[in-house]
């Protein structure tokens, strides 16, 4: 069995998004024993993700790093691959490119998520760029938003035959591609191209099992080996002795990730009637100006039972039991959203580090001694 990884985020909903603070947080996360940390890549809500990840890379030595998540629209695939590869080199091979169809990064510039067809094409191109295989010039040019495809009429006697990252060193593995997915079409695209598929379906093992089955069926159809794609999950993790407080901490993230299941105005995957009711409420009330914010009115529409199913909240032992069940069905990377490090929310973060992180099954490292700062 391959090692299970426990990641968290370089920002929590209430923490500072000042890039100068995030390198310090990366150091803290590394000392607390996390395997990796991801960063939101949304240009209107955060500083540049790759600049911050570079800063985090030179400030740490073992912490894996990734975007959570990039999108196929705001950067050309060659630019996105180049940025990820640069962090890969600087970090000594610790970079993972997390990507989805696009959400807040596009909504805040007045655009919708990329189509699944575009996303599929971009995944194929990213894979080629990151492995230093040539991308056909026609494919590369087709992704230019305002450029002028073709080289006719300009002074070039001998043009490159393909588009590639010529500078990539040969001594490092390619950047892993991790797709954030919730619906069957995106899961299938990821199964054809990605190294990891991380599901935004919460901690409901029945919905996650459905998603894994969709991925495995497409992998088989595409002729990919069973172990060539690994599975992860984006999960809110908010342990606390006061379960009501834990639910309140989780509401913003639970709501924003629940929305992914209804982004196209239809519910993806198997759901109970109660889950359907809550998802319909999210669909009709979501306020993008309060994205991920527990103070947003949209976060108040969720029932406690729904939050308890979607998130890992309350008793740490119960959280660990659920994590163990998810490992049993094939989840090997946990992308945990956790609370801020300080204040009362810090009590939840401390429990996550002290009472849950060391008990995540099959991790390939000894837990670190949590920081008491």
Residue ranges and their predicted role:
Residues 4-10, 37-39, 65-68, 95-99, ...:
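Hydrophobic faces of well-ordered beta-strands that scaffold small-molecule active sites
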């Amino acid at each position: 069995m391959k090692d299970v990884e426990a990641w968290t985020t370089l920002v929590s909903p209430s923490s500072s998004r000042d890039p100068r603070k995030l390198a310090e947080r990366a150091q803290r996360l590394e000392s607390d024993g996390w395997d990796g940390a991801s960063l939101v890549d949304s240009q209107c809500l955060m500083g540049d993700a790759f600049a911050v990840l570079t800063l985090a890379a030179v400030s740490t030595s073992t912490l894996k790093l990734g975007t959570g998540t990039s999108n196929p629209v705001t950067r050309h695939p060659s630019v996105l691959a180049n940025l990820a590869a640069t962090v890969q080199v600087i970090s000594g091979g610790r970079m993972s490119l997390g990507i989805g169809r696009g959400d807040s990064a596009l909504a805040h510039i007045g655009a919708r998520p990329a189509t699944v067809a575009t996303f599929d094409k971009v995944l194929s191109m990213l894979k080629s760029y990151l492995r230093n295989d040539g991308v056909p010039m026609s494919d590369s040019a087709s992704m230019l938003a305002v450029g002028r495809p073709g080289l006719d009429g300009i002074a070039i006697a001998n043009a490159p035959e393909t588009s590639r990252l010529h500078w990539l060193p040969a001594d490092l593995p390619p950047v892993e591609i991790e797709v954030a997915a919730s619906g069957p079409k995106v899961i299938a695209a990821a199964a054809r191209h990605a190294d990891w598929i991380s599901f935004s379906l919460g901690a409901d093992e029945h919905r996650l099992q459905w998603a894994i089955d969709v991925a495995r069926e497409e992998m088989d159809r595409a002729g990919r080996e069973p172990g060539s794609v690994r599975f992860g999950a984006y999960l809110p993790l908010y342990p606390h002795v006061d379960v009501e407080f834990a639910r309140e901490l989780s509401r913003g993230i639970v709501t924003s990730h629940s929305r992914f299941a209804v982004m196209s105005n239809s519910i993806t995957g198997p759901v109970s009637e109660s889950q359907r009711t809550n998802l319909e409420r999210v669909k009709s009330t979501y306020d993008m100006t309060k994205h991920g914010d527990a103070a947003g009115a949209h976060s108040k529409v969720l029932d406690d039972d729904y939050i308890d199913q979607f998130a890992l909240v309350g008793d740490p032992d119960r959280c660990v039991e659920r994590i163990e069940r998810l490992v049993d069905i094939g989840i090997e990377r946990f992308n945990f959203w956790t609370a801020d490090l300080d204040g009362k929310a810090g009590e939840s973060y401390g429990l996550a580090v002290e009472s849950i992180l060391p008990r995540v099954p099959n991790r390939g490292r000894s837990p670190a001694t949590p920081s008491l700062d």
